[in-house]
């Protein structure tokens, strides 16, 4: 009898892992992406791009494109809309542009980004 109870509890635990809503999972990963970018942790941001992107773009190429040209001060996910294998995330990003000799302060903008389900995980889509 104790073995049967353990099997039931194990099955219930595994089932609960799959019950995370795509919107919640994507929101968390998008927040992690922007936290990494704001902290200058380009390697962590790169790890959240899709495996198919990483097959054709190296970390150094990603870093050249998305290094610290504009200082990201903060970001917050505003909205997540999901289809079965694609989510659109609207994120408010606050940046301090690096303009030589000009101080423009912090600028806030909203970005729409795509997250794709690939190999059972959500990844940030990045144009090549």
Q: Predicted regions: what is each one?
A:
Residues 8-11, 39, 69:
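Alpha-helix termination/capping residues and helix-transition junctions
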Residues 14-39, 47:
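Short, low-complexity N-terminal intrinsically disordered segments enriched in polar/charged residues
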Residues 1-16:
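Sec-dependent bacterial lipoprotein signal peptides
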Residues 42-83, 88-90, 97:
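Short solvent-exposed beta->alpha transition segments
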Residues 22-27, 38-39, 55, 86, ...:
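Solvent-exposed, acidic/flexible segments
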Residues 83-128:
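Exposed beta-sheet edge and beta->alpha loop/turn motif
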Residues 10, 19, 119-123:
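Non-catalytic interaction surface on structured domains
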